[in-house]
Every structure is written in C-alpha cells, then in structure tokens.
Amino acid sequence: KMIVGDITSLDLEDTFGKLAGTIDVVIGGPPCQGFSQKGQRKTIHDERNFLFKYYVSVVELVNPKYFVMENVPNLLTAEGGYFRHEIEELFNKLGYSLEYGVLNASDYGVPQNRRRAVIIGKLNGDAPKLPVPKRNDVTIWDAISDLAYLESGEGSEEQEYKYPAESDYEK
C-alpha cells in the first residue's frame, strides 16, 4: 500500500499498527526541501527536516525485516552529520543495523544524473551492502531514440513504435 499525503495528519497507530509483522520491507523518503541545495537551507530550524522521525515511527510500528530510506545527499552531511547521527541512533535503538551512502542513478543504467542518499536497515543482523556501481553509461538518446517525432498537438496516450530499437536499453 502506498500512502500519498501528509503523514503528520495520520493516526500512525491506526494506519500502520495492524501491519506489524506482515511487511518485509518499508520503502520511503521524508520530504527533503529543507536539505536541498536549491534555495535557502535552514536545516536545524526547519521542522520539515525532522519528518524522518515519522518514518522511524512507521518502521517501529510495522517492524519489517528491512527498510530503505532515500533523500537528498545533504541529509547525511547537514549540520555536521547531526541528522545522520540522529537517524542512526533511533534505528539502532529499534534493533536495526544500517548501511548508507550516496548513490547516483546513472551508475546503475538510468539515463539520469541523480544523486540520492540511501539508508538500508536490517532488523537483528548486518544490513546489506549498497550495490556496487555498474557504470554502463546510458544516454537519453539510448533510451528514447526509437520514439516517434511529434508535432505540437499530435499524439495520444498510446502509440505504436515507428522505428526499431537502436540500443539494448530500448529493447
């Protein structure tokens, strides 16, 4: 189940408590505007930067074997690592070991240069290592060169391919 909305308006116990022990992995990421390099960062004074505590509460209620949390890279370094340390401490108290770092989608075959902080947690054991970069440079051209050219106003929700795939990525 995916919840799209403001987690602060939910009754966490009512929403997630009944899922305890039935979910293997919780995947999500708290809002990151306060950590973003775009615009002014107020980090320690921005209440949005503490929404990770709701994520921790959900993990505590659901009690999954694993969790994966993602955010902007500054989550790990803001305020001298304060937030990273806080996250580590909270999850360690729940019995989770952590592995974390910054991954770039382009290192895993995605035609996008997108760096994200990733935190993986495992309950009662060593957290899995982050995946090793595979660095197979996929360009936007590799991904979409077989799409038809459209003029303004043309097209529909679905359309047949007009050209054969030119790259392994398109296949």
Where are these regions (language model features)?
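Generic N-terminal simple sequence motifs
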Residues: V26-I27, E60, D107, A127, ...
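S-adenosyl-L-methionine-dependent DNA methyltransferase catalytic core
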Residues: L90, R116-K171
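Conserved Class I SAM-dependent methyltransferase catalytic core
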Residues: R48-N113, A117-K122
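Generic structural "secondary-structure junction" signal
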Residues: S9-L12, Q37, D46, N74-A78, ...
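A structure-centric signal for secondary-structure junctions around beta-strands
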Residues: V4, T22, N113-R116, W141
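Short, surface-exposed, polar/charged, turn-prone segments marking secondary-structure boundaries
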Residues: P31, F52-V56, L94-S97, P128-L130, ...
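Residue-level signal for pocket-adjacent positions within structured domains
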Residues: M2, P30, G39, D46, ...
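Core alpha/beta nucleotide-donor-binding catalytic domains of modification enzymes
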Residues: K1-N63, P73-T77, Y82-H85
